[in-house]
């Protein structure tokens, strides 16, 4: 059984990942890191987990963990990894955007592999660091994959995509209020 740690577990991404790990037969949730909620039950941030876990948030990490997921806001994974080191055998999966671009993929001896298992399975299986694609990149790649495999992409692809507000995280900002987001499209 692989032991898993989640960094930034109080947000939407962290909450969904906690739920998936708790239900996975080959994974064991060892810790969920949050400096703002340390000592509080996970269910305070994620009431949908009531009855699934009694675990609490912690401000401690296990550097020998098998897998660590970074569920931090964009731009925060680099800073976290500069302050916290993990064993060479630890698989690091960044769900933010810090390591998605090739020029950012090499970090302190690790080469972050970007991609989806459907497209880069072999490279991901060998990796000790993974940069997970964002929601739009994932949706577009999965939608176009069957066409690309059959050589049916004959011209440029143009996509129009709309996002909700959960991608912005749980923190409030001037752009996360309904009155600002309602019918607010940029062209």
Where are these regions (language model features)?
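N-terminal Rossmann-like NAD(P) cofactor-binding subdomain of oxidoreductases
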Residues: 1-187
């Amino acid at each position: 059984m692989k032991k898993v740690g989640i960094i930034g577990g109080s947000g939407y991404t962290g909450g969904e990942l906690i739920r998936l790990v708790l239900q996975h037969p080959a994974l064991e949730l060892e810790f969920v890191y949050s400096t703002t909620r340390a000592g509080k039950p996970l269910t305070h941030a994620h009431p949908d987990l009531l009855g699934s876990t009694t675990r609490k948030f912690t401000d401690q990490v296990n550097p020998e963990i098998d897998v660590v997921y970074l569920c931090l806001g964009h731009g925060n994974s680099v800073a976290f990894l500069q302050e916290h080191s993990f064993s060479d055998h630890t698989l690091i999966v960044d769900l933010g955007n810090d390591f998605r671009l090739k020029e950012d993929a090499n970090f302190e001896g690790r080469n972050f592999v970007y991609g989806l298992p459907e497209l880069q399975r072999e490279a991901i299986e060998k990796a000790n660091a993974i940069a997970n694609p964002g929601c739009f990149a994932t949706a577009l790649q999965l939608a176009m994959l069957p066409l690309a495999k059959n050589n049916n992409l004959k011209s440029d692809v143009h996509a129009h995509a709309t996002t909700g507000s959960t991608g912005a995280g749980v923190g409030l900002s001037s752009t996360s209020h309904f009155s600002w987001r309602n019918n607010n499209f940029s062209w």
